């Protein structure tokens, strides 16, 4: 869950998955009822939110503001616009392992370096980035029992750009008690980092030496394309409960490597960092390399029930991919409605667990063959995560407000074989703790 430079890029672009999810949710509302008299169109409904995310030990923090606006443009025809701006700062892990001696790393630009104290976690503490994201969607009925949603999305960062389109279709059956939905999304994303894209598995070089970069220190660009497909069914079980099932398929092609991640090459007995290229004054660090294709399949189910005026929901998601990552997510909410004024209190618990990618390595041993694909990015490693939180909301004269606070904890498992020599004295997969706070205000309803 860590929010850092590549939080949106480690797998499927969120513009794709997020747009597809939004389109699908928009289509799962009530079916289009027949109109027999003219009705007044709904005014603009605007929902604005501010979110703060902060990791422990001075690591990454994120401050985000977003606005969601929806306007009925005709009978059951809605235009939805979103704008998000966020800024990230802090210390970002680069994939190297701790050492009993100070370590020096060349920054991604190739124009500067930084040093980590002996025994310290290899973090680049000058990381910062900003992101602006825009999206628009259009919902409209195509018959009495069906409707469609079409949308576009765009986001821009200093070194990364996303563009995407999405489409959704939903059809009601069984006296509107059953809804079948289909969705598709396509995105094209581009990396364009300062200093150029590193050559996969090349050694890190000293400041001003671009031999390890594919573009000689220029702003080389690499692209990836992502396609998402979704099919789902939502069933009303009785007046108090509904259930939903979704299957989604995601395919990514192109540059799926993180150009900012490296691996340490250490002595297989002492665990001490091997010397880097002659004259560089650095240890031996190799830039990671991931496969150029990835296919993910997800199975999702949600059960929601009204319990005497309160609402309980539980969902489960299983994801598997051809990188050999399998994940399980269980999400639970219980909304206590507190009478007049729309007041409610909603506790939230989330459990997450995943296995490691087949090419994940905590480090590499000097003298051993280097795999074709390898990464020390701990987001690709084996870990478990737990989130607990609470949300409060109430109506206002012109809308509604809500606030939530969540605590996140993540613990992982490094490769046991990597704890050799000096490395046995360090935690090669440190725990991660984070706090999430959000406030939102909705008006115009």
Model-derived features: where do they sit?
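Cleavable N-terminal export/targeting peptides
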Residues: 1-42, 201-213, 445
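Outer-envelope beta-barrel architecture signal
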Residues: 40-46, 75-83, 132, 144-148, ...
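Transmembrane beta-strands of outer-membrane beta-barrel proteins
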Residues: 45-51, 82-84, 139, 149-153, ...
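Transmembrane beta-strands of outer-membrane beta-barrel pores
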Residues: 50-54, 85-89, 152-158, 171-173, ...
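Solvent-exposed loop/turn segments connecting transmembrane beta-strands
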Residues: 54-62, 126-130, 154-164, 291-294, ...
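Outer-membrane beta-barrel translocator domains and adjoining extracellular loop/strand segments
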Residues: 59-63, 82, 92-98, 153-155, ...
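Outer-membrane beta-barrel translocator/channel fold
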Residues: 82-134, 179-240, 250-253, 344-394, ...
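Outer-membrane beta-barrel "beta-signal"
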Residues: 169, 431-445
């Amino acid at each position: 869950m860590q929010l850092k430079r590549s939080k949106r890029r480690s797998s499927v672009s969120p513009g794709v998955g997020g747009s597809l999810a939004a389109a699908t949710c928009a289509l799962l509302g009530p079916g289009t009822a027949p109109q027999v008299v003219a009705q007044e169109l709904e005014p603009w409904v605007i929902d604005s939110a501010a979110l703060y995310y902060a990791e422990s030990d001075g690591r990454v923090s994120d401050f985000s503001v977003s606005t969601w606006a929806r306007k009925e443009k005709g009978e059951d025809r809605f235009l939805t616009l979103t704008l998000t701006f966020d800024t990230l700062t802090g210390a970002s892990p680069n994939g190297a392992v701790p050492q009993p001696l100070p370590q020096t790393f060349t920054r991604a630009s190739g124009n500067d370096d930084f040093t980590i104290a002996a025994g310290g976690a290899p973090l680049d503490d000058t990381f910062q980035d900003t992101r602006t994201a825009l999206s628009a969607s259009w919902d409209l009925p195509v018959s009495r029992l069906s409707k469609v949603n079409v949308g576009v999305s765009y986001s821009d960062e200093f070194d990364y750009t996303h563009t995407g389109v999405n489409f959704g279709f939903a059809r009601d059956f069984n006296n509107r008690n059953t809804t079948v939905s289909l969705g598709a999304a396509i995105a094209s994303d581009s990396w364009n980092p300062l200093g150029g894209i590193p050559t996969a598995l090349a050694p890190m070089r000293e400041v001003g030496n671009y031999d390890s970069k594919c573009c000689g220190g220029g702003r080389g660009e690499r692209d990836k394309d992502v396609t998402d497909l979704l099919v789902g069914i939502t069933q009303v079980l009785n007046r108090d409960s509904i259930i939903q099932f979704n299957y989604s398929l995601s395919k990514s092609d192109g540059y799926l490597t993180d150009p900012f991640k490296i691996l340490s090459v250490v002595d297989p007995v002492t665990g001490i960092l091997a010397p880097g290229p002659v004259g560089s004054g650095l240890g031996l660090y190799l830039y990671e390399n991931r496969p150029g294709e990835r296919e993910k399949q997800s199975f999702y189910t949600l059960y929601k029930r009204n319990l005497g005026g309160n609402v309980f929901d539980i969902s489960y998601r299983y994801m598997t991919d051809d990188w050999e990552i399998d994940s399980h997510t269980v999400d639970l909410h219980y909304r206590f409605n507190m009478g007049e004024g729309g007041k409610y209190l909603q506790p939230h618990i989330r459990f997450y667990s995943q296995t490691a990618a087949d090419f994940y390595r905590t480090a590499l041993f000097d003298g051993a063959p280097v795999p074709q694909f390898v990464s020390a990015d701990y987001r690709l490693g084996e870990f478990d995560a737990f989130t607990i939180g609470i949300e409060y909301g109430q109506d206002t004269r012109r809308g509604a407000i809500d606030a939530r606070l969540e605590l996140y904890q993540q613990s992982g498992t490094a490769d046991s074989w990597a704890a050799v020599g000096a490395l046995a004295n360090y935690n090669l997969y440190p725990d991660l703790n984070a706090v999430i706070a959000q406030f939102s205000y909705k008006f115009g309803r």
